[in-house]
Amino acid sequence: MTTQAAEVAKRRTFAIISHPDAGKTTITEKLLLMGKAIAVAGTVKSRKSDRHATSDWMEMEKQRGISITTSVMQFPYREHMINLLDTPGHEDFSEDTYRTLTAVDSALMVLDGGKGVEPRTIALMEVCRLRDTPIVSFINKLDRDIRDPIELLDEIEAVLKIKAAPITWPIGCYKDFKGVYHLADDKIIVYVPGHGHERIETKIIDKLDSDEARAHLGDLYDNFVEQLELVQGACHTFDKDAFLKGEMTPVFFGTALGNFGVDQVLDCIVDWAPQPLSRATHERNVEPTEEKFSGFVFKIQANMDPKHRDRIAFMRICSGKYEKGMKMRHVRLGKDVKIADALTFFSSEREQLEEAYAGDIIGLHNHGTIQIGDTFSEGENFGFTGIPHFAPELFRRVRLKDPLKSKQLRQGLQELAEEGATQVFFPERNNDIILGAVGVLQFDVVASRLKEEYKVECAYEAINVWSARWIECDDEKKLKEFQDKAFENLSVDGGGHLTYLAPTRVNLSLMEERWPDIRFRATREHH
């Protein structure tokens, strides 16, 4: 095996998806602890004080205690290199989250054992399904009261349309939580409370049918054996092929806060989750073991460092090897650039990078030339596909408090739109500026960032827009005719694309009927 093939085989790149408050930030910290990445995992409760969770860093996040921006963390574990992408857990950030899911090879779904499958999880799973991403499931919070585990598995199957195969099974919960039983290995992994901040040797009892197991389970033993027979009769047995096709999810139980069960999840990702996979471009499929470098930008983030007013473009490497100082082609601009200062991410610590391989996420300093969806290669002119924009669902008109700052406002919005924080539309018929977002919180984020980073204060006004559709048409004459007739509702987005802003659902249906040659697109590939 070549060095490069060996490096690719070591990589596991995955994202965590969950509903807010299911324990995602805690599990992120515990995973880093597994990789000895943070000596002491700061509990999330200390957020209100000075010690903020390492993966939540922007000012507004510190106030609200939510991870708005996607952060990337790399750490070693069992001779593998783990790339963990933390996705925004808050209701509103599905566009950013969506694109993060385009950059991973598998995902870890975290469910709150007391609540089961929640709306945000459903939305994220739909995104994973678009690419048949393999999903590992972790049912969290067993140190509290949880719902019946069989019910939880049924719900995963019914609501998320994926087969659930339990790998471990909980023994009791809340005050009676004794640990989990590993179905295939016939062993009990004993829960010892109070070790949330440190790694401890796990105590294991071999064989459920043993005196030691009976002593540990006490009064719970007979009931547990009975329940287990039911589980083994009714539940799916794990099938790795079905998992890799995105049809089945292995399910683990534990408590992230108690640092229990997280290591089994990480072992599963190392043992079963795919190494970096091939990626589609407009021209051909690119294999991770190819010698020549290639990658795509899936996210741009401003001001990761309050000390530097910089923007960082996050790039997923798809093939080859990054070496410090190498030349690569920025395909959209047709320009060759020398990259000497790419970054690797260790939570909020940033380090200069010497080399990186397929599956790794690297950060490029962006001075306004890099956009989401950009492809970089070692000379070849192709573009990676599957990194869409989504039609926003909410719209506001922007009103400037100081009319003299309109230049700063436009610059700020242009940069925030390139970064994917919002979408901006300029109507053809007047000088309004309209913002589009997938969730309300995005508007707050944009206003607070305009104020902090661009010294511009703005207010929002309601506007009569139901949804946006990108316009495509092969017939120039028809397009011109459409533009004349639909002038009142046409805008140009931040990327210069013609967009129809429909005032109502009925209006959009009528327009689609009336103009069969015009394509009204709800998503737009980044070009």
From Swiss-Prot:
Key words of the record: Cytoplasm, GTP-binding, Nucleotide-binding, Protein biosynthesis
Superkingdom of the organism of origin: Bacteria
Pfam families assigned: EF-G_D2 (PF22042), GTP_EFTU (PF00009), RF3_C (PF16658)
Keyword Zinc-finger in annotation: no
Entry GO MF terms: GTP binding; GTPase activity; guanosine tetraphosphate binding; translation release factor activity, codon nonspecific; translation release factor activity, codon specific
Main subcellular localisation: cytoplasm
Entry binding sites for GTP: 18-25, 86-90, 140-143
Signal peptide: none
Location of this chain's protein in the cell: Cytoplasm
HAMAP family xref list: Rel_fac_3 (MF_00072)
Protein family: Belongs to the TRAFAC class translation factor GTPase superfamily. Classic translation factor GTPase family. PrfC subfamily.
Protein name: Peptide chain release factor 3
Record organism: Pseudomonas paraeruginosa (strain DSM 24068 / PA7)
